[in-house]
């Protein structure tokens, strides 16, 4: 269980932030290979995760390829995952798992060590699904588009 001590919420939360960073890095990799009018430069890499996801969804939609249906679903799943990440990382987590949002009108909730570990694993799995889709579907599609353009 990620080597955490019983009741330790901080170590699993560290894995949430680590896996979220790797997931965002994989999204950056996807955006760097998707065809776009303007290159995916360092300015765009500084965008919020929500903006990156919207941009990636738009670029994938513009390709109009049924081979990318799975990728569309993966990108859609990410919005909820990163919203949960924001709640955990930007909220105030107290002993016993009491989580208070910094947003007005959001109620307090409880999270356990197991909840946080499970969520870290969901982020890791999402990143792996995105990587597989990029390698299996996006790269071959982009390569064939370049070949058609060069012909």
Predicted segments, located by residue:
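Short, glycine/alanine-rich amphipathic alpha-helical segment
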Residues: 50-73, 104-121
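Amphipathic alpha-helical interface elements
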Residues: 1-58, 72, 76-83, 87-90, ...
